[in-house]
Swiss-Prot record:
Residues that coordinate or bind ATP: 14-24
Top EC category: ligase
Residues the record lists as binding Zn(2+): 202, 217, 220, 223
Co-factor requirement: Zn(2+)
Organism: Rhodopseudomonas palustris (strain BisB5)
Protein name as it appears in the record: 7-cyano-7-deazaguanine synthase
Reaction catalysed by this enzyme: 7-carboxy-7-deazaguanine + NH4(+) + ATP = 7-cyano-7-deazaguanine + ADP + phosphate + H2O + H(+)
HAMAP family hit by this protein: QueC
This protein's record includes keyword Metal-binding: yes
The record's free-text note on cofactor binding: Binds 1 zinc ion per subunit.
Recorded superkingdom: Bacteria
GO MF terms held by the record: ATP binding; ligase activity, forming carbon-nitrogen bonds; zinc ion binding
Family: Belongs to the QueC family.
Length: 238
């Protein structure tokens, strides 16, 4: 993870999920100004994008300092990603493991595309620091979440844009329990409660069932990881 600078602006990949909300808090605690970018790529759980507004309202309520730092929130439509992908995140099919050992929720190239588009927007807006919630500690095995992938992409983007671009991944070596703890450390119980209530993780887009860790089907891999992390975090917090 590249060191952050307190006098710079950062662009955070902000989907409306637990990880991106935690990364937003991390960026707000380290940068002078923070902008956000989300992607509409035809995902089944597009409800996550709708969660961003309430999350941002919550961030403003938690801290006047955070409120003053929050900048523009951008949304980019990438329908082509859904058109070329045949996955459980972009099709109404059952979630299962593929023959290659990866779950069929893996959207090939998704994070590579997200970060490249984010870097293009950041270039136009004079931003050199980009923050993403990629993690290879407690994850589904996606190869584009690995640290070596992110470091290689950082080098490629910096070379291709002739500018020193920094990709920050504050969750890379944290499991989900540690991610919950980081939210607690950054924003106290108010931030944890905000993430529980208004962030979205469930791959199926389920918002009807409320659990102690938030909303979701409770069965998909994303819900399972979030629930497991919550149980471990809660046990340590007692």
């Amino acid at each position: 993870m590249t060191e952050a600078s307190s006098d710079h602006t950062a662009l955070v990949l902000f989907s409306g999920g637990q990880d991106s909300a935690t990364c937003l808090a991390w960026a707000l605690s380290r940068f002078a100004r923070v902008e956000m970018i989300g992607f509409d790529y035809g995902q089944r759980h597009a409800v996550e994008l709708d969660c961003r507004a309430k999350l941002l309202d919550g961030f403003r309520a938690i801290s006047p300092e955070w409120a003053a730092k929050l900048g523009d929130s951008h949304t980019l439509a990438i329908p082509t990603l859904s058109a070329i992908s045949d996955t459980a995140l972009t099709r109404d099919v059952e979630i299962a493991m593929g023959a290659d050992g990866l779950p069929n929720t893996f959207v090939p190239g998704r994070n590579l595309i997200f970060l490249t588009f984010a870097a293009a927007l950041a270039y136009r807006r004079g931003i050199a620091d980009i923050v993403g919630g990629m993690c290879e500690t407690d994850y589904s095995g996606y190869p584009d979440c690995r640290d070596d992938t992110i470091r290689a992409l950082q080098n490629a983007i910096s070379l291709g844009m002739a500018r020193d671009v920094k990709l920050h991944t504050p969750l890379m070596w944290r499991d989900k329990a540690a991610t919950w703890q980081l939210a607690q450390d950054l924003g106290g119980s108010a931030l944890v409660d905000l993430i529980v209530e208004h962030s979205h993780t469930c791959y199926l887009g389920e918002r009807g069932a409320r659990h102690d860790w938030g909303y979701g089907c409770g069965e998909c891999p994303a819900c399972a990881l979030r629930a497991k992390g919550w149980r471990e975090y809660s046990a340590k917090a007692r």
